[in-house]
Amino acid sequence: MAAQGARHGLQVRERCGVADTIVSGMAGRYATALFELATEAGAVDSVKADLDRLSALIAESADLARLVKSPVFSAEEQLKAISAVLDQAGISGLAGNFVRRVAQNRRLFALPRMVADYASLVAAMRGETTAQVTVPAPLSDAHFFALKDALAQQTGKDVILDVTVDPSILGGLIVKLGSRMVDASLKTKLNSIRHAMKEVR
């Protein structure tokens, strides 16, 4: 099944082949459609850079985050506002068309997940994997690289850390590595990093 995005070259299919093992759901289908277009155009890296820049803008602006997440705004209002942001940020081409199509389809609320899924597809293409890490305070360089090395040893791949700071968590460190279970040896390494973080605090 193709979504209404065909006019911009964006076709969202129900089945995405090997990508199904990496991403899933509606956001995964959108991300895969964009990834396929970017691959064909030789623009995988530039599209990722544009999406990362837009994600940073959303993270920095409460108003923009509300626009993306709130169902109160109409598709027309979201499209007009997000288009202005894209133009101001100099985001055009595939990434710009993609975000506009997402807004027109009333799927802007899922944009952060789509961006994350696109990053996962890019990482898989490069032989990398992405770990979602939640910490109560920013990681020091030493803790960042200790965690990165521990996860790399566990997966046998270069690991990209997607770090989120959430002061409300009490465990010191939460790591999500796709659907893989954290084994005992890695848990021991993570615990040592947790204890080190607590000592610094």
From Swiss-Prot:
Localization (cell): Cell inner membrane
Keyword entries, A-Z: ATP synthesis, Cell inner membrane, Cell membrane, CF(1), Hydrogen ion transport, Ion transport, Membrane, Transport
Membrane disposition: Peripheral membrane protein
One Pfam family hit: OSCP
UniProt entry tagged with the keyword Transport: yes
One cellular component (GO) term of this entry: proton-transporting ATP synthase complex
Domain of life: Bacteria
Family the entry assigns: Belongs to the ATPase delta chain family.
Functional summary from the UniProt entry: F(1)F(0) ATP synthase produces ATP from ADP in the presence of a proton or sodium gradient. F-type ATPases consist of two structural domains, F(1) containing the extramembraneous catalytic core and F(0) containing the membrane proton channel, linked together by a central stalk and a peripheral stalk. During catalysis, ATP synthesis in the catalytic domain of F(1) is coupled via a rotary mechanism of the central stalk subunits to proton translocation. This protein is part of the stalk that links CF(0) to CF(1). It either transmits conformational changes from CF(0) to CF(1) or is implicated in proton conduction.
Name of this chain's protein: ATP synthase subunit delta
Taxonomic source organism: Xanthobacter autotrophicus (strain ATCC BAA-1158 / Py2)
